[in-house]
Design a protein with these regions (language model features):
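Alpha-helical segment of the N-proximal tetratricopeptide repeat
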Residues: 12-49
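Conserved structural position within tetratricopeptide repeats
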Residues: 10, 41-44, 74-78, 109-112
C-alpha cells in the first residue's frame, strides 16, 4: 500500500500519494479494511470531502459496520442534501435494517438527483423497483402516497 511505502520509503516516488485512488483499487480488489485505511488518509488530505466520506461509508458497509455507515451517510447529507449516492446507500441500509418507511424519502431523493450515465442504470433501476415495492406503486408509474396513521388499522385489528 502506498501509505506503507511512504512510511518506510519503499517507493522512489516522492510525490503526493493518491490515497483515494488507492482506496478505490483496494475496494475493487475486495480489500475493504485496507481501503478504509486509505480513504481515511484521503480524508486527511481533503477534510469533509463528501465523495471520500461516501467511499468510507461503503467500506463500513462491506465490513459489517453498518451503524458507522449510516452515521457517515447522514453526515454527508447534512453537508450536501442532494448527494445522490449518500441517499442511495442510506436508503438500502435502512431497508436492510427494517426501517422501510424511513428509506422511502431517501429513495425518492436519489431518484430525483440520480446520475444518468450507463454505470448508474442498474442502481437507478434497483431504487425504482425498491421504491415501488415499498410504496405499492401501481402500473401507472405514479407513486402512491404513504397512508396516514388514521387510515391504518388499529393495533388490535392487526392480530
Amino acid at each position: 500500500m502506498a501509505w506503507w511505502n511512504k512510511l518506510f520509503g519503499g517507493s522512489g516516488d516522492t510525490g503526493r500519494v493518491d490515497y483515494y485512488g488507492e482506496g478505490l483499487a483496494l475496494m475493487t480488489a475486495g480489500k475493504s479494511h485496507e481501503a478504509l485505511t486509505s480513504f481515511r488518509l484521503a480524508l486527511k488530505d481533503a477534510p469533509g470531502d463528501g465523495v471520500v466520506l461516501q467511499q468510507i461509508a461503503m467500506a463500513y458497509t462491506r465490513i459489517g459496520m453498518t451503524e458507522e455507515a449510516v452515521k457517515t451517510y447522514r453526515h454527508v447529507l447534512q453537508k450536501n442534501p442532494q448527494a445522490a449516492g449518500a441517499h442511495y446507500g442510506l436508503a438500502f441500509l435502512l431497508v436492510r435494517s427494517g426501517q422501510e418507511a424511513e428509506a422511502i424519502p431517501h429513495l425518492r431523493a436519489f431518484l430525483e438527483n440520480a446520475p444518468s450515465d450507463a454505470d448508474a442504470r442498474e442502481h437507478v433501476s434497483h431504487a425504482r423497483e425498491t421504491l415501488a415495492r415499498l410504496t405499492g406503486e401501481g402500473g401507472s408509474g405514479e407513486v402512491e402516497p404513504m397512508p396516514s396513521p388514521a387510515d391504518l388499522p388499529a393495533q388490535d385489528e392487526l392480530f
